[in-house]
Amino acid sequence: MAPPTNQRKRKAVTRDEPEISDVESEAEFGDGILEGILSQSEDESDDSAAEEDSEDEEDLDEEELEALDSDEVPSENGEGEGSMTRTSLNKINADEDDDKPNYTVVKDANGGERYVYEEINPVYDSDDSDAQEPTNTIGNIPLSFYDSYPHIGYDINGKKIMRPAKGEALDALLDSIDIPKGWTGLTDPSTGKPLNLTQEELEVLRRIQTNEVPEDGYDPYPDYVPYFSGVEEIMPLSSAPEPKRRFLPSKHEAKRIMKIVRAIREGRILPYKPPQEREEEEEEHHYDIWQNEEAQPDHIMKIPAPKPPPPGYDLSYNPPPEYLPSKAERKEWEATDPEDREKEYLPTAYDSLRKVPGYDKFINERFERSLDLYLAPRVRKNRLNIDPASLLPKLPKPEELKPFPTVTQTLFRGHDGRVRSLAIDPSGTWLATGGDDGTVRVWELLTGKQLWSAQIGDEEAVNVVKWRPAKDAIILSAAAGDDIFLMVPTIIDPVAESNSRELLDAGFGYATNATQALTANGQKKEPVATWARPTSRLQDEGVLIKITVRSTVKVINWHRRGDFFSTVSPTAQKSAVAIHTLSKHLTQIPFRRLPGIAQTAQFHPSRPIFFVATQRTIRSYDLQKQELVKIIQPGARWISSFDIHPGGDNLIVGSYDRRLLWHDLDLSTRPYKTMRFHNKAIRAVKYHKGGLPLFADASDDGSLQIFHGKVVSDAMENATIVPVKVLKGHKVKSALGVMDLDWHPKEPWLVSAGADGTCRLWT
């Protein structure tokens, strides 16, 4: 009898697998532990395992069938062996049913093999018992589409999901009374069944309600684990002090932050915007409706409206008390007609700004403003747009205008009381001074040594000293009281002294032979001045002539040739100004009457013009034509002194009201320049006679102001005046400072006389 054949079909092997020897596998993979590692695909491993199982089963079946077909008689134990054989045979048949494959092999569209698996039928012992119920896979489609069908959708396999049965009203009432666990009262839209919560979802909701972490097993307070090892250390790991960088802000972080800040400022980093907003902004288009508008020029007759005046202090809600009207002023304002009122309002004070009421005349003011703009004509005033700095002359720097005196070179001490006057001789060697002590002193200019002195006034002070300008004879004139003294100091060389004495003595013979003037009655006129010799003591000291006039002499000025000199006696009336002739010993009164009190007089340096200054004006007279030439009006309240430029076309005036005035005689009778640099009265002014463009003034504030005055011959160019230096050294005593000054005839040196009894040489 042929052995029964096995009815199970073996799975065909699709490809041959190469045989790998044990030696090679051990050498290649080490220990060869490859449990769970698949050499090929899962399908191939399943096929190979199925083949091995089928071979073992075939071998077992053949052995069992041979045993059953044998004719041998069983032993005593044969019955047991037979039962055992039947049991094993039943087991084999059962295993055949269990080991039956769960798929079928079919041909696919390409002619290849395709495995179709059977549907799993889950039972209680199945591993798929926890699988969820079939879900509805209709997608995002409203369930109302299936209202007319018995099913509500399809599952993953395409089978219909039938509509669940609906409970009656009694069931709904029972469900609402006896609420099951997990009941929500909602219906699942995808299945149509009640939506209940699982135990896990209920636990999550409970944790959320109790402010706990929803995650199961999360410990918010775990046990602290030491940072290093958990072993307590006796010695510190590092005892180094804390570095300073831990207490200071990081420079590297500051650099990074500043880099980001610069990028934000430059626009390279922009704030985050959602893509939707960014797209909306890009889609938005903004159009400039005035983009193509061209600027049109205003009408030629258009004049802009004037701006309203800004409010003043009286319009404040809490103005100062002086702006608030009194009761009388308020009544007067209320009684005045509105048209006659100076202001349309009365200043009012309020404690705070919130208490200020509305302005009741706002509409009236706006209306009046509109009327003004509409009816009032407008006038355009053309203003010169000139830079004020361009109108100022460009003055040179004082350093470029040197030389001029800056420091004290020599100090002259010897007078008791004030030094009222001083003068430098034409050669620039000697300095003559006169003071309150009644003495005339002659000093050596460079060394400050006193060389000669004479006491000409017993009780009167020496008001003025002057040297004769000519160099053929050296004569010094001085005035003390109403006496004028002409003297020849004994310090000069014998030849010059002899010539000077002869010049003074020649006038006595002319005065003896001259006829005296008679009055209308035939009587002799009283002489204006008396020329005589002084006492023998004064003659021995060098004082040769004494001229007595009617009043105290304050000013002496010589003519450039040295034969005439003028004197001024402010207290006299008719004989205030006198002109003396040295060669004839003659004194003349040129003015019968002056319109004011004479202050000083001076000869023109090159022309026959005589200047006389009163308190407010300076008059110039032509001595040849004997007529008035010009009246100069400085505008000062009280003229103290004046001096004429060596060129003869300019004049400076000093006044007691602290003004220094420069006059251009060819330009105008008014001052060309007025300077106010002193705090007190100006006593004396003087030009430099040696060709240097310098002049100076002396003031009662104890200072001297040095100026650079450039005068050109071009009539189209004005004089340039630059203050260059302020000299301070004299002390102020009894409100008097510097009394007089004089320039060296050649050098830029200046000598000043002060009320402190000293003289100073400035170089």
Curated annotation (Swiss-Prot):
Q: Name one GO molecular function term.
A: ribonucleoprotein complex binding
Q: Where is this region: Disordered?
A: 1-110, 318-341
**Matches recorded under Gene3D superfamilies:** YVTN repeat-like/Quinoprotein amine dehydrogenase
Q: Which PROSITE patterns does the record match to this protein? A: WD_REPEATS_1 (PS00678), WD_REPEATS_2 (PS50082), WD_REPEATS_REGION (PS50294)
| UniProt keyword terms in alphabetical order | Nucleus, Repeat, Ribosome biogenesis, rRNA processing, WD repeat
Any one Gene Ontology BP term: maturation of LSU-rRNA from tricistronic rRNA transcript (SSU-rRNA, 5.8S rRNA, LSU-rRNA)
Q: What does this protein do?
A: Component of the NOP7 complex, which is required for maturation of the 25S and 5.8S ribosomal RNAs and formation of the 60S ribosome.
Indicate the family of this protein. Answer: Belongs to the WD repeat BOP1/ERB1 family.
What name appears for this protein in its UniProt entry?
Answer: Ribosome biogenesis protein erb1
Source organism (scientific name): Botryotinia fuckeliana (strain B05.10)
